[in-house]
Amino acid sequence: RDFTHTIIDNSDLFSESRNTRLG
């Protein structure tokens, strides 16, 4: 896995976490 892909995955996890908190 390349560095760019890792950043994208981290962004997705962060967005998903925020959405869960918002309900």
Curated annotation (Swiss-Prot):
Subcellular location(s) per record: Secreted; Nematocyst
Organism (species): Phyllodiscus semoni
GO molecular-function terms, A-Z: toxin activity
A Gene Ontology cellular-component term: nematocyst
Lineage: Eukaryota, Metazoa, Cnidaria, Anthozoa, Hexacorallia
Role, per record: Nephrotoxin. When injected intravenously in rats, causes severe destructive glomerular changes. At 24 hours post-injection partial disruption of the glomerular basement membrane, massive thrombus formation in glomerular capillaries, severe mesangiolysis and infiltrating cells were observed in the majority of glomeruli.
Keyword terms, alphabetized: Nematocyst, Secreted, Toxin
Protein name stated in the entry: Nephrotoxin PsTX-115
